[in-house]
Regions:
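Compositionally biased, low-complexity segments
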Residues: 12-14
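C-terminal beta-sandwich interaction modules and adjacent acidic
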Residues: 17-401
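Intrinsic-disorder/low-complexity loop/linker signature
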Residues: 9-10, 59
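Intrinsically disordered, low-complexity terminal segments enriched in Ser/Thr
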Residues: 1-5, 9
Length: 401
């Protein structure tokens, strides 16, 4: 048995987890079609990419067969890149490209009934005899949910990668000539997300020696990060070592965090945007040294006006943050949006009497992994969803004065 204590500003909740057969659902996500014939049920909307596997997307579709008139019911899971507004679909222009899609016929059912997950068992108890469970297994080379931040004057839905579970009534699963009316569909948007690895490795280190005109010896620069992965909202510590053997003067140090967004669709295009830049007035004279740590903090709140910046996908009006680094196995091609970060340490060196002719910058770059930690509550949900924890007891809250 595990005991968890969750604290917020209003109460302390003691959560006890055990192994058992009874199952208790905290929340169910439901969407019903306009005609009321079908309803889509999911137990969660965030599905975790564990690099070597992805959470199974499992749910239930409720079907009222009395008004189908011989039609069938299907459900699909689609990963798509949206690069335009839905409003343009009315004139025959679709600005949405499916990266991956899978369809399942739900009614009439085909084949034998598969083993239900604990989540589906709970949903079936809620839905009743008209429920039909479904499961999708996403491949590991799909991108995560990422949106491209619109500009201050942009309207409509943001561009980016999204995931959609959709149930619909039709004669065929995928017929371009068949018109499926909106009242015959219901859909729920979900997210595919990644969390920071449990084991944080040592950070990157880079060094360079650079010579200058009118100077016999170089400037040595070494920069390193304390750790490989930093969490959103945490300060990033950059350790800098400088040995100025030249006759030049280092006027100041500039540290920048850049976001690299690689959009892979018909071609591969990379967009680089600074998300944090700080200048430090450290002067290192000729034949002097410096060893010091500096802190910077990239935040979305300081980049709200930057159009095209990658942010983590969100549902409805939830708060979000800068897009997390995309982790992959490296041996599979990935389409969509791939996000990475780097830290640039730049020494601004004075040119002396000849100005820019004899002065130059000294720069090193460090790869940075920027992600969110896995919340304890998500860990509990994952264990529950996988069947490793099959009931949850919430003890009445202890009020805090």
């Amino acid at each position: 048995m595990y005991i968890y204590i969750v604290v917020n500003k209003n109460a302390i909740y003691i959560i006890s987890l055990s192994i058992g057969r009874n199952l208790k659902m905290a929340k169910v996500f439901k969407k019903t079609s306009g005609n009321g014939q079908i309803a889509l049920y999911l137990g969660k909307r965030d599905f975790v990419d564990h690099i070597d596997s992805v959470d199974v997307v499992d749910g239930v579709v409720k079907v009222d067969p009395s008004a189908l008139n011989g039609k069938k019911v299907f459900v699909y899971l689609a990963c798509a890149f949206r690069y335009g507004s839905d409003d343009l679909d009315v004139i025959g222009l679709s600005f949405r490209r499916d990266i991956w899609i899978q369809r399942i016929q739900m009614y009439p059912p085909t084949g034998g009934s598969a083993t239900q997950t604990p989540m589906q068992e709970s949903l079936m108890k809620k839905v009743g005899e008209q429920g039909y469970p479904f499961s999708f297994q996403m491949p590991t080379n799909l991108p995560c949910s990422v949106s491209l931040q619109p500009g201050p004057n942009d309207a409509g839905k943001a561009c980016g990668v999204d995931f959609e579970v959709k149930a619909y009534v039709a004669n065929e699963a995928d017929n371009a000539d068949e018109v499926i009316e909106k009242k015959d569909t219901c859909r729920l948007m979900i997210r595919k997300i990644q969390y920071a690895p449990a084991n944080n490795k040592a950070g990157a280190k880079a060094e360079i020696s650079k010579g200058f005109m009118m100077s016999d010896k170089p400037v040595h620069l070494e920069a390193s990060l304390e750790k490989e992965t930093y969490y959103h909202g945490d300060p990033i510590t950059v350790k800098v070592k400088i040995n100025n053997e030249s006759s030049k003067v280092v006027k100041k140090i500039k540290i920048t965090v850049e976001q690299l967004t690689n959009v892979v669709l018909y071609s591969s295009d990379t967009y680089i945007k600074p998300v944090c830049s700080e200048e430090f007035g450290e002067t290192i004279n000729a034949n002097a040294t410096l060893e010091k740590s500096f802190q910077i903090m990239p935040l979305l709140s300081n980049n709200k006006e930057k159009r095209g910046l990658s942010v983590d996908g969100r549902l409805k009006d939830e708060d979000t943050h800068l897009a997390s680094t995309t982790l992959s196995q490296g041996d599979k091609e990935m389409q969509g949006i791939i996000v990475s970060y780097k830290v640039k340490v730049n020494l601004m060196v004075a040119g002396g009497l000849l100005g820019g002719l004899t002065g130059s910058d000294v720069t090193v770059e460090l790869p940075l992994c920027l992600m969110s930690p896995k919340p304890a509550a998500n860990w509990i949900k994952d264990q529950f969803h996988r069947g490793e924890v099959t009931w949850v007891v919430f003890i009445d809250p202890i009020k805090v004065n």
